[in-house]
Every structure is written in C-alpha cells, then in structure tokens.
Amino acid sequence: MGTFTLHQGQSNLIKSFFRNYYLNAELGLPNDMELREFALQPFGSDMYIRHLSFSSSEELRDYLVNRNLPLHLFYSSARYQLPSARDMEEKAWMGSDLLFDIDADHICKLRSIRFCPVCGNAITSEKCERDNVETLEYVEMTSECIKRGLEEARNLVEILEDDFGLKPKVYFSGNRGFHVQVDCYGDCALLDSDERKEIAEYVMGVGVPSYPGGSESAPGWVGRKNRGINGVTIDGQVTIDVKRLIRIPNSLHGKSGLIVKEVTNLDDFEFNEALSPFTGYTIFLPYISIETEVLSRNIKLNRGVPIKIESSIGIYLHLKNLGEVKAYVR
C-alpha cells in the first residue's frame, strides 16, 4: 500500500512553525520537574520517546529545539525518585496528581469524513484502491460541542471544590476538550487506583440516587440532581491511572497546532484563533471540497485550489488532514 506522508505535521514548514514556537515558549512546568518523567511524540513517528528527565526549563528547551522537536509533549502526573529509569518499578513512585479528562467528542455527535488525499473522493475504507494510498479522516470540532465540554468542566470544578474541598485547575486540551488537574501532596497524592476510581464514579454520578422534590439551591447532589445534572462525563481511566502522562501547559497539540492553555475564568473561554500562537498568513492547498466550521468560523475549501488564509487556520486545517500548508506569507 502506498503511504501518503505530507499530512499530520510531516512537512518541514509545519516543523519550522513548531520549532520557532518552542524557542521562546514559556511552558507550564511543575516546581518539582526533576521528579517527573517527560515524554514526547516527535515529528515523523508514531512512537513515543519516554523516560526523559530534566532539571530546568532551559535544559528541556535545548532538548526540544535541537534534538527532538515534539508533535506532542507530556510530563507525568506521578513523581518518581528516578524518573529516567526505563523500568516502571525502578522509577519508585512517590505519589501523583489527580486528573480528569473531558473529551467533547464523547459528549457530541460530530461530523466525520474519510477521504483519499490524492483523488479527493469520500471513501469508507482505510485504503483508496484507485490510488493505492491510505485514506485520511477529518472530524469537525464545533464551538457548540466545545461549549458543552466546558459546561462539563464547570460542573466538575463545582463538585471538586464543594464536595472535596480541592482546588482544581482547568486546561483546554489544545484539541477537543478539557483537562482538570488537582496538584496533590500528602494523602491526596498517595491515593491508589481503587480510591481514585471511587472519586471518578462519584463525579460521574454512579450510584447517586434521585432526590425528587429537592431544592435546586440545595448543596451537593440534591441541588445538582434537581438542576438536571446527573453526573459529569469524564474518561474514568485517566483518573484511575496513577502514572498518567499529562500534556504540558503551553505546549502545542500536534493535531491542531493550538496551545494547551489554562482556563482561569471559564466564562471568558472562547474556541477561536486566539488559541493559536501563529500569526501572518499561509497558502493552503485543500485535498477536498468542503464547507466546515474551523475555530468558530465557517470556511469553504475547493479541492486543488490554493487559498490565502490566516496561519492559525491554515496550520489547523493541515493538522486536521484537510490539505497542506504550502507557504508562509508574513
């Protein structure tokens, strides 16, 4: 089977955008970064590079810019005595933060299209027989779906603050949802998988009874149930995992080119071009003809017809498989 290699961040131009970003990016690193495992997926590979350890932001930056430019960049929720050890037992787990993952595509039904990047035809299989290449998939992420994910994050924050007395931070994942993180120390950090599962099930509303006739303003689940909140839609496996990798705040998501960004005020969050660090314009060559919503804008593309468009949009379209960024225009 032929392999089509110019999509998903493989072009040198996209790499240059990412490298220039990481030259000056102020990554959101934990104060105890020397206790964390770092990992990344480099450009041009499906494999992750793991078991990395850094003691300063400068050391990390030098590695990213000069040795392994990341398409995706992570650190561990766990703290380890030896984070660079390749054997998980040798790392010596010291506790971990508490994580929650909200994927908007688990909440909404999104439009999905699979197509051949050569002929542009819609194809349901993973291969185009005519051109002997692998097909690509595009999933449209809408602002309405992101809003629904944000509402789930809002409900989760309320539960963690009011019912557990925790101080969660909310991050836009950089692509299709939100991460909610509690920096844990002491007993919180030492919660095992079973205890974290209980917390996950609690916020999902598993086993929580109905309270008919209760007041909407009542505290806890009584008020939530009577406001129509039956639970928060999270990926429970993320919460249970005590050795999970976290996307580094202010890193770039390799499937969108958007920043993994802390949301300090949920009321002010907007799914738009401001989430991209890229300025200027690009020349974008579409693989297919399509009208689609992109970062809260309606975009019309015609197959094979180059379009001059903001770099934030062009890079997003490229990483979403809809075509190629061919040039940068200042």
From Swiss-Prot:
GO BP, one annotated term: DNA replication, synthesis of primer
HAMAP family assigned to the protein according to its UniProt record, in alphabetical order: DNA_primase_sml_arc
Amino-acid positions noted as binding Zn(2+) in the UniProt annotation, renumbered to this chain: C116, C119, C128, D131
Official protein name in the record: DNA primase small subunit PriS
Cofactor: Mg(2+); Mn(2+)
Any Pfam family hit: PriS_C
InterPro entries cross-referenced by the UniProt entry: DNA_primase_S, DNA_primase_ssu_euk/arc, DNA_primase_ssu_PriS
Protein purpose: Catalytic subunit of DNA primase, an RNA polymerase that catalyzes the synthesis of short RNA molecules used as primers for DNA polymerase during DNA replication. The small subunit contains the primase catalytic core and has DNA synthesis activity on its own. Binding to the large subunit stabilizes and modulates the activity, increasing the rate of DNA synthesis while decreasing the length of the DNA fragments, and conferring RNA synthesis capability. The DNA polymerase activity may enable DNA primase to also catalyze primer extension after primer synthesis. May also play a role in DNA repair.
SUPFAM superfamilies registered for this protein in UniProt: Prim-pol domain
Key words, A-Z: DNA replication, DNA-directed RNA polymerase, Magnesium, Manganese, Metal-binding, Nucleotidyltransferase, Primosome, Transcription, Transferase, Zinc
Family, as annotated: Belongs to the eukaryotic-type primase small subunit family.
Cellular component, GO annotation: DNA-directed RNA polymerase complex; primosome complex
The protein's Enzyme Commission number: 2.7.7.-
Key word Manganese present: yes
